[in-house]
Amino acid sequence: KEFDGEARKAINMAIKTYTWHFLLVPKSDTMGYDITTKMQAYAPSYISENKKVTEDMEAVHNVWMESYKGAIFEANYVAGSKNSAGKSKSGRLLQNGCEYMIRIGRCATCYECLHYYYDNSKASNGGPVRFFDSNKNELSY
């Protein structure tokens, strides 16, 4: 069990938000980046054969995260160290840190992990992050 489902959902949200940000705010072609809509597209044929991984992705498929000012922001994420939550409000989700916080009970949901890393960070424009469903209804997480 590498990642608990809630940690995996948080990682999925960070990856999705990061990719959407750079679709909306492209990096310069001279920098060698090639970010396209195919990078974060839902394709059932590519979903893991592991039922739990598929369920976790589906759980956040129609949810998006934005800054309190309404911007899709650069939600950085890195592996991080095992058995350490890392710094809160850093604007950078630690994959292993999120798994650690879920495992020890410091966070119960993917949304709590996302709030831990992104709320009041420079990345999210200094306020709490917000979550919305596909109908643009704000979710109270």
Task: List each language-model region with its residue ranges.
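Conserved, single-site charged/polar hotspot
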Residues: 1-141
